[in-house]
Each structure stands twice: as C-alpha cells, then as structure tokens.
C-alpha cells in the first residue's frame, strides 16, 4: 500500500517529538497500520531545525503552500494559538486535507466553525493530543464509552498548576515561590497566566464536555478561576481536615443544564484524584453503565503528546478507507444530534464549600456567623477555630453541606458586613466525587 504522507506545521517540542516517534517506531507503526507514514513536507520558522529533524522532507516557509501540496494527505497542525493556525487548518480542510491537531485553544474557541466545514468536505479532524497529552481520553469519550450516558467528568488537566499545588502542600511554600521554581524547572512559562488562571484547563474541559453531552463547544460560558490567589494556609488546613486542593475541571449534566467550570477544589484525600501529584494529569469519568473510570498519565511533554499525535495519524489512515457514514463522529454524536444545551451560571450550581474567616476573637462571633449561614439555608458540616493570629483576631474554618452557590455567596456577603469580621472571606468549592 502507498504510504500516508503528512505535512507538519510547526517543529517545536511536539512537532520534533512526532518526528522522533515516526522515526524510532517506524517498524512497529507499519506492523499495526500495514503501510508507512512518511513526512513529506514541513513548515517552521527555522529551516535548519527542519533539515535536522527530517532531511528527506520538503521544507516550505509558507503554511498555505504546505496545505495545498498534492503530496500531503494529512496536515498535522502544531503551531498552537488561533491566528495562523486557524487559517491554515481551515484552508487545509477546504483543500480536502485531513487534520491532526494538538491545539486545544483552536478547537475550544473555533471548533464550531472547524467541525461543520470538515463534515461538509468529508474530512477527518483528530485531536487526541489536545486534551491531557498522552492520555487517550478523547478516544475513550468518543468510542470506548459510546454505550453510556455520561454523568460527569472531573479532571486534573494542567500539569503546571498541579505541580505548584503539590509543592505548596509538600513544602508549605508560598505560591509565588513555587511558581519561580516551576519556571526554573521548565514546568511553567515565563508568562504563566494561561496555565495558572485556568484558561488551559478550561479549553480542555470544554472539549470533553462537548464530547460527553453532545453539545457545540461552549468555552465562552466556561467558568474560570485559577490558583494564583491560593494561600498556603488553606492547603495546610485542607490537609488537616482530610482534603487536598487541586485545580479541577468539572462538567456535569444536571436536570437544569450542564455545569462547565474550572477552579481550585477540595477533594477528599481518599479519592484517587486527590493523590495525583506533580505534573501528572488524571481524568475521572462517571457514566451510567460502566460506573466510574479513571485515566492517568503524562499530560504534556514531547513524547507523550507526540504519541497521541501519531496515534491520530494512524486512525485517519484507517478511517479514510471507510465511507463517511461509518466514521467516528468528530464530537462523538451524529452531527444532527449535536444540540445546544443550557450551561448553568455559577450561581445555580450545587456544591459544598470551604470557608476561611478572620474575625475578632470575642464572645458571640461564631454565633453571628452561624446564624447568617442558617439564614441562607446553609448547613454547617464542621466549624473549627484554628487559633488566634494577633491576640485579637481568630481564624475560623467552616465546611458546609451541599448548597446552591447563590446562597453561600449571599451568606458570605452578610458575614463580611459584620463589624467583627476583619478580612474578606476565602471560599473554595468542594467535590466529593461520589456522584
């Protein structure tokens, strides 16, 4: 059989990794696929780098030239971002080229434009590497769990944030200090905003939510809250209470709509997700027939991500032989069945909450706080005074039972208005993961 010819757009960490996987595992791939995968053309800012990676491939400076080449069957987009990457992908699809991409931002923000065009052009778009690197969660959601109604997904899907939180817990260090360490180790970018403020995880949970529930991409409705304001005291107190704080991406189908959110979360330390540390990723899926499944592995890095990229190329080489009616739908459901659904505003979600209050250490303070929580129908699971800070101020930690978020916010506003409360209240959501 004739080889599958690919064109690489971008030869950075993942692009170089993909070339290495194709070179080092060429025999294994051919045994599985029955034919060779060949890099026929490459596009990058550095021609020297391209020549080093694959001397036999054509080098082109213009990405639009690459996506028009007759000797390219599959365009592998590894530029990242939504500028030239978006335009090149759309032009490649118009030219009838199949697509492999690791670009979660592109899909979460422009998937509603890309996938319909691909269907119109009978083109396959594969994107396993866009979510959780080498973990095959996209294939699980699109194929392995196809017999199930998915109830919820919760994932640790940003290695930078997970490394920072793990180090803060283990060393008791402040956020700013651990961020510097992460940057020195290469785990965080010079500008870490995309990772630490939840954008990266938001793109990933948006994609998984669309696959789980048969909706268009809804990134603009995804709630994002990062870890930059977390205090090491909260991580310490959470651990003392039997919890660990993780940046969690959550999507859940309820009777009122779909929850779609990213934020720091207290997870019981007995749960497997709570014990995912360092730069590792994990995704928990709860479905009606199979129950709870967990997917764990490297969520980033050259070879883990490249492994997913090459697996997608192999899938395309197999699927392209099938007529379009027998291909796996891009968003797991048949295109006509992909339907918009309500994304719940945060005020309407239901959760338990961790509160840390700094208040005057005087009689009646706890009673006033408890009364205001009760006034909003917020039930207290635990209330602990952690000690006196400066002889006059006490630090109080409260865990609530499950309640609607607008009620806890109203209670917090009322408590903050008390004369005895000295500082803004810290609120962190909790997930039992027992749904």
Curated annotation (Swiss-Prot):
Keywords, alphabetical: Amino-acid biosynthesis, Metal-binding, Methionine biosynthesis, NAD, NADP, Oxidoreductase, Sodium, Threonine biosynthesis
Binding residues annotated for NADP(+), in chain numbering: 14, 104, 186, 189, 301
Record text on activity regulation: Neither NaCl nor KCl increase the activity. L-threonine and L-serine do not markedly inhibit the oxidation activity.
Listed cofactors: a metal cation
Example GO BP: methionine biosynthetic process
Residues involved in L-homoserine binding: 189, 200
Activity's dependence on pH: Optimum pH is 10.5.
Keyword Amino-acid biosynthesis part of the UniProt annotation: yes
MF term (GO), any: NAD+ binding
Catalysis performed (reactions): L-homoserine + NAD(+) = L-aspartate 4-semialdehyde + NADH + H(+)
Keyword 4Fe-4S attributed: no
Binding of Na(+), residues: 128, 131, 133, 135
Pathway it works in: Amino-acid biosynthesis; L-methionine biosynthesis via de novo pathway; L-homoserine from L-aspartate: step 3/3; Amino-acid biosynthesis; L-threonine biosynthesis; L-threonine from L-aspartate: step 3/5
Binding positions for NAD(+) per the UniProt entry: 14, 301
Domain ACT positions: 354-429
Catalytic residues in the record: 204
EC number assigned by the record: 1.1.1.3
Record note on cofactor: A sodium ion is seen in the structure; a metal ion may subtly affect the relative position of the nucleotide-binding region to influence enzyme activity, and could increase the stability of the enzyme.
Matching InterPro entries: ACT-like_dom_sf, ACT_dom, Asp/hSer_DH_NAD-bd, HDH, HDH_cat, HDH_CS, NAD(P)-bd_dom_sf
Protein family membership: Belongs to the homoserine dehydrogenase family.
Assembly and interaction partners: Homotetramer.
Its biological purpose: Catalyzes the conversion of L-aspartate-beta-semialdehyde (L-Asa) to L-homoserine (L-Hse), the third step in the biosynthesis of threonine and methionine from aspartate. Is highly specific for NAD(+), and displays an approximate 479-fold (kcat/Km) preference for NAD(+) over NADP(+).
UniProt protein name: Homoserine dehydrogenase
């Amino acid at each position: 059989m004739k080889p599958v010819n690919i064109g690489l757009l971008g030869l950075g960490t993942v692009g170089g990794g993909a070339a290495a996987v194709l070179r080092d595992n060429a025999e294994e791939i051919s045994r599985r696929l029955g034919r060779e995968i060949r890099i026929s053309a490459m596009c990058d800012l550095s021609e020297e780098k391209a020549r080093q990676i694959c001397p036999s491939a054509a080098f082109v400076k213009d990405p639009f030239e690459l996506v028009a080449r007759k000797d390219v069957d599959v365009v592998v987009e590894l530029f990242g971002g939504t500028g030239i990457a978006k335009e090149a992908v759309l032009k490649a699809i118009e030219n009838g080229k199949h697509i492999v991409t690791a670009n979660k931002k592109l899909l979460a923000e422009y998937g509603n434009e890309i996938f319909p065009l691909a269907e119109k052009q009978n083109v396959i778009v594969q994107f396993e590497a866009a979510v959780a690197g080498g973990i095959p969660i996209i294939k699980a959601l699109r194929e392995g769990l196809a017999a199930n109604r998915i109830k919820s997904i919760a994932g640790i899907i940003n290695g930078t944030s997970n490394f920072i939180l793990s180090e803060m817990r283990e060393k008791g260090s402040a956020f700013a200090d651990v961020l510097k360490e992460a940057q020195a180790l290469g785990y965080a970018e010079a500008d870490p905003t995309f990772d630490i403020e939840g954008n990266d995880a938001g793109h990933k949970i948006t994609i998984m939510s669309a696959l789980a529930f048969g909706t268009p991409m809804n990134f603009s409705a995804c709630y994002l809250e990062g870890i930059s304001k977390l205090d090491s005291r909260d991580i310490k107190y959470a651990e003392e209470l039997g919890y660990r704080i993780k940046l969690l991406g959550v999507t859940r189908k309820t009777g009122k709509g779909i929850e779609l959110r990213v934020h720091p979360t207290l997870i019981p330390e007995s749960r497997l997700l709570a014990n995912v540390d360092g730069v590792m990723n994990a995704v928990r899926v709860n479905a009606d027939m199979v129950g709870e499944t967990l997917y764990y592995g490297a969520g980033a890095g050259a070879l883990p991500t490249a492994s997913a990229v090459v697996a997608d190329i192999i899938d395309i080489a197999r699927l392209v032989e099938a007529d379009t009616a027998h291909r796996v739908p891009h968003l797991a459901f048949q295109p006509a069945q992909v339907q918009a659904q309500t994304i719940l505003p945060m005020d309407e979600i239901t959760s338990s909450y961790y509160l840390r209050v700094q208040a005057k250490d005087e009689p009646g303070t706890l009673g006033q706080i408890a009364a205001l929580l009760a006034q909003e129908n917020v039930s207290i699971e635990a209330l602990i005074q952690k000690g006196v800070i400066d002889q006059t101020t006490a630090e109080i930690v409260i865990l609530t039972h499950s309640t609607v978020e607008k009620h806890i916010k109203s209670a917090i506003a009322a408590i903050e208005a008390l004369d005895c409360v000295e500082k803004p209240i810290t609120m962190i959501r909790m997930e039992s993961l027992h749904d």
